Curated annotation (Swiss-Prot):
GO biological process annotation, one example: positive gravitropism
Tissue specificity statement from the Swiss-Prot or TrEMBL entry: Expressed in roots.
Keywords: Differentiation, Growth factor, Hydroxylation, Secreted, Signal, Sulfation
Bias kind Basic residues: ranges: 80-95
Annotated region described as Disordered, given as residue ranges: 72-95
PTM-bearing positions, type Sulfotyrosine: 75
Propeptide: 25-73, 90-95
GO CC terms, sorted: extracellular region
More about this protein: 'Golven' means irregular waves in Dutch.
Protein name stated in the entry: Protein GOLVEN 9
Sequence positions bearing Hydroxyproline: 86
Residues passing through the membrane, by range: none
Protein species of origin: Arabidopsis thaliana (Mouse-ear cress)
């Protein structure tokens, strides 16, 4: 009984030790990370809200124009109907 409890305790301690080793630093230095964070905080945003809004609007209009261009072959425009011949306009031939 003592041997199995000793093996179990050794196994649990070994597992805890492996977890502890895996939680160590992942490369780089903490001082370097802090310097990068300070540089990022000190930077001011380049775009204003109005510029961001106009950029978003221009993207949406570009997408709408692209969809219109792709769909114009499948759906004829109601604004520009095809020209009809005089027969279809109701003009009869007078012989």
């Amino acid at each position: 009984m003592k041997k199995t409890s000793l093996k179990l305790m050794t196994l649990v301690l070994g597992f805890c030790f492996v977890i502890y080793l895996l939680q160590g630093p992942r490369g780089g230095s903490r001082n370097g990370d802090l310097l990068i964070a300070r540089k990022l905080i000190s930077l001011e945003p380049i775009e204003t809200k109005n510029a961001a809004r106009s950029l978003k609007d221009s993207i949406s209009t570009d997408l709408e124009e692209e969809v219109d261009r792709l769909m114009e072959h499948e759906y004829p425009s109601p604004v520009k109907p095809r020209k009809r011949t005089p027969v279809h306009n109701g003009v009869r031939n007078r012989h």
